[in-house]
């Protein structure tokens, strides 16, 4: 992202830290629940289409081009941020559309200690 957009995003967080923290907390909670619909809903309200294209969708397409050949050869673990998991342009959908089997890894996320 251009530095001007990064700065604007940072300034929004500084101007409204409670809102930024609440949005972050909601996203983390949805991620821990593996609630993809909630993640998609939260992200749709937090980022515009142009931002999502640059930060999520273009990167998902680039990763797909690299991952598909590798995943056809062997099993691969892919770890990405929550925004890359959802929607019609999400990484799991793109990989499935390429004929690959995709499944989440089970387990529970550890809660961070308070005050750290």
Positions of the model-derived regions?
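C-terminal structured interaction module
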Residues: 75-115
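Hydrophobic, often amphipathic alpha-helical segments used for membrane interaction and targeting
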Residues: 2-72, 90, 106-108, 112-115
């Amino acid at each position: 992202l251009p530095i001007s957009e990064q700065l604007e995003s940072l300034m929004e967080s500084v101007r409204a830290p409670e809102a930024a923290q609440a949005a972050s907390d909601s996203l983390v909670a949805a991620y821990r629940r593996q609630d993809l619909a909630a993640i998609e809903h939260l992200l749709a309200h937090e980022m515009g289409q142009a931002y999502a294209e640059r930060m999520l969708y273009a990167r998902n397409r680039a990763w797909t081009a690299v991952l598909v050949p590798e995943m056809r050869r062997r099993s691969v673990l892919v770890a990405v941020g929550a925004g890359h998991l959802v929607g019609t342009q999400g990484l799991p959908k793109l990989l499935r559309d390429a004929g690959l089997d995709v499944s989440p890894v089970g387990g529970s996320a550890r809660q961070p200690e308070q005050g750290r």
